[in-house]
Swiss-Prot record:
Keyword set includes Transcription regulation: no
Molecular functions per Gene Ontology: 6-phosphogluconolactonase activity
CC terms in the record's Gene Ontology section: cytosol
Broad class of enzyme this protein falls into: hydrolase
Species per Swiss-Prot/TrEMBL record: Salmonella paratyphi B (strain ATCC BAA-1250 / SPB7)
Keyword Hydrolase tagged: yes
Pathway(s) of this molecule: Carbohydrate degradation; pentose phosphate pathway; D-ribulose 5-phosphate from D-glucose 6-phosphate (oxidative stage): step 2/3
Assigned protein family: Belongs to the cycloisomerase 2 family.
Name used for this protein in its record: 6-phosphogluconolactonase
Domain of life according to the entry: Bacteria
Role description: Catalyzes the hydrolysis of 6-phosphogluconolactone to 6-phosphogluconate.
Phylogenetic placement of the source organism: Bacteria, Pseudomonadati, Pseudomonadota, Gammaproteobacteria, Enterobacterales
HAMAP family tied to this protein: 6P_gluconolactonase
EC number, as in UniProt: 3.1.1.31
Keywords on record: Carbohydrate metabolism, Glucose metabolism, Hydrolase
């Protein structure tokens, strides 16, 4: 299995393309100059395209991924109704979802042969919209509205329109600020990192009709932490055994173990990392975690070790200015 790591650095308007080997070493393959401040990125389900959001001219760009080394070639672009904060796709590669924090909306762009061709829907009044997350069954889009302390639930129609479910939303505790999410591989639980109080909520998907319930909330900060809380990103290993979330003020990654059924998280430790970690990701083998330091202008590679999933640093690498996003592609 070959793996490629992509890092987005908006201040220098660059994407760095790296080859990741089995020992956790990165080798630079390409530096792409992007026409705009590049932030969120996602790989298409068929692994042929990288979709990225740019500003100040709000667009989604599509790059073809070379099958031999992961290098990028520009392919297409499509306008967006707001500054892109988060980007994702449905599991069939038919639609791109973009959340915009500043515009307070989520948009749906139709894909044709892997390329973005037209905007098909926009939902407004989602204050602080920070991500758009499709459920494993490809039926429901979960959209955290950070400033409203709620996660909005939409059914994805066949033509890409978003229809509010019943109930149309679930609420976090006041002042939590729900931000990014991941789903457990067993499809029965979701995990949301809350930016403003640096906690993680565990949501149980109780039935196929969208009924969900918060079954656990866990503080992700050390007991002696007293500074401003500012959580950012969250990811889970492919086997569902380990979960990680980062806080930018503390510049740390919190390590969680996950119960076998996915319902319970336990804090296992805290890993100091690059300054102001805005984004990170986990490779497809579940062996390595790559974190980006927005203020250090470096990325660090960690090996995930032992039954607790603790992190051991393998190396760090200079990237562009202000790196914010990391994605990994396996082929």
């Amino acid at each position: 299995m070959k793996q490629t790591v992509y890092t987005a650095s908006p201040e220098s308007q660059q994407i760095h393309v790296w080859s990741l080997n089995h020992e956790g070493t990165l080798t630079l393959v390409q530096v792409v100059d992007v026409p705009g401040q590049v932030q969120p990125m996602v790989v298409s389900p068929d692994k042929r395209y990288l979709y990225v959001g740019v500003r100040p001219e709000f667009r989604v760009l599509a790059y073809r991924i070379a099958p031999d080394d992961g290098a990028l070639t520009f392919a297409a672009e499509s306008a967006l109704p707001g500054s892109p904060t988060h980007i994702s796709t449905d599991h069939h590669g038919r639609f791109v979802f973009v959340g915009s924090y500043n515009a307070g909306n989520v948009s749906v762009t139709r894909l044709q042969d892997g390329l973005p061709v037209e905007l098909v829907d926009v939902v407004e009044r989602l204050d602080g919209c920070h991500s758009a997350n499709i459920t494993p069954d490809n039926r429901t889009l979960w959209v955290p509205a950070l400033k409203q302390d709620r996660i909005c639930l939409f059914t994805l129609s066949d033509d890409g329109h978003l229809v509010a479910q019943e109930p149309a939303e679930v609420n976090t505790v006041e002042g939590a600020g729900p931000r990014h999410m991941v789903f457990h591989p067993n499809r029965q639980y979701a995990y949301c990192v809350n930016e403003l109080n640096s906690s993680v909520d565990v949501w149980q998907l109780k039935n196929p009709h969208g009924e969900i319930e918060c079954v656990q909330t866990l503080d992700m900060m050390p007991a002696d932490f007293s500074d401003t809380r500012w959580a950012a990103d969250i990811h889970i290993t492919p086997d569902g055994r380990h979960l990680y979330a980062c806080d930018r003020t503390a510049s740390l990654i919190t390590v969680f173990s996950v119960s076998e059924d996915g319902s319970v998280l336990s804090v296992e430790g805290f890993q100091p990392t690059e300054a102001q970690p805005r984004g990170f990701n986990i490779d497809n083998s579940g062996k390595y975690l790559i974190a980006a330091g927005q203020k250090s202008h470096h990325i660090a590679v960690y090996e995930i070790t032992g039954t607790q999933g603790l992190l051991t640093e393998k190396g760090r690498y200079a990237v562009g200015q202000g790196p914010m996003w990391v994605v990994v592609n396996a082929y």
